[in-house]
Design a protein with these regions (language model features):
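N-terminal amphipathic/basic-hydrophobic helices that include classical n-h-c signal peptides
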Residues: 1-22
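Conserved short alpha-helical segments that host acidic/polar catalytic motifs at enzyme active sites
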Residues: 20-261
């Protein structure tokens, strides 16, 4: 490189260094701040460990803009959660709104935004992996949005847990290929990761980009449920489900809110 080229780029390099130094890659934010300014987060998964390190925390919520999307409620079925129509007479397309977002297996908890929950369950039961299961699935066929499939799985062992998260999204505007991203985490007290389908409202809807966002996980399940629910867009939010699992005893606490009651 000649000296003139090196000198001309020096100022930009120093600016870039200052920018990088000012960034905190370990910063986490409250769920309030992560959702309050986004009118359409879509569907969201949060997984992490409470601040005191004693519980695994999972949250799943759904939002909707159309009458078909908003016509949904969460229902508990044993240790699983199902999504059903609130008014069956108004169902237009049941394929993308009726599914089990949460399923419990021995030593594992699966949470997703679609029927890939059952794909993951079936593969795990057969001795295969989270990644193997999702290699068989793609983003949703709802052109032009190509809504990504987001998934998570907690694995409990020795009084602690690890977790994986995945997003399957379209490689281009035409939906010609699927890009698959998987993230693997060791649980850290007070830290969670938040993965959601959309960056905001739009036409088409802008797909989530980047890594799962780092979120704070408090000790109080009621406070955390309220924090997320009250800061989701009032017009578009539909339901939320939160589960805390005690890492020593396995005891479970659940909170569920349905806008349709």
């Amino acid at each position: 490189m000649d000296s003139s080229a090196e000198g001309s780029g020096n100022g930009g390099s120093k600016t870039a260094e200052r920018t990088v130094k000012s960034m905190n890659v370990y910063k986490k934010d409250t769920m309030k701040n992560l959702v309050k300014d986004n009118s359409y987060v879509g569907r969201g998964i949060v997984i992490g460990k409470t601040e005191d390190g004693t519980k695994a925390a999972v949250a799943y919520f759904i939002m909707g803009r159309s009458e078909n999307s908003r016509n949904r409620i969460f229902k508990e079925e044993g240790e699983d959660v199902m999504i059903y129509p609130f008014d069956a007479s108004k169902v237009e397309d049941p394929s993308l709104i009726i599914y089990a977002p949460i399923r419990k297996l021995d030593g594992k908890l699966i949470v997703t935004n679609g029927d890939q929950t059952d794909t993951i369950r079936d593969f795990v039961v057969a001795g295969k992996s989270f990644e193997d299961a999702l290699e068989t699935r793609e983003f949703e066929p709802d052109a032009p949005n190509w809504t990504p499939r987001i998934s998570g799985m907690l694995t409990f062992a020795d009084g602690d847990f690890t977790y994986k998260m995945s997003i399957l999204k379209s490689a281009d505007e035409a939906g010609t290929a699927c890009n698959r991203f998987t993230y693997s985490y060791k649980a850290i007290a007070g830290v969670g990761h938040f993965l959601h389908t959309y960056m905001g409202d739009g036409s088409p809807l802008p797909t989530f980009t980047g890594e799962p966002e780092r979120a704070s996980i408090p000790n109080d399940i009621d406070a955390w449920t309220k924090e997320i629910w009250e800061n989701l867009n009032e017009q578009n939010k539909i339901s939320i489900y939160v589960r805390f699992t005690d890492l020593k005893t396995g005891a479970v606490e659940n909170r569920m809110i349905n806008k349709n009651v």
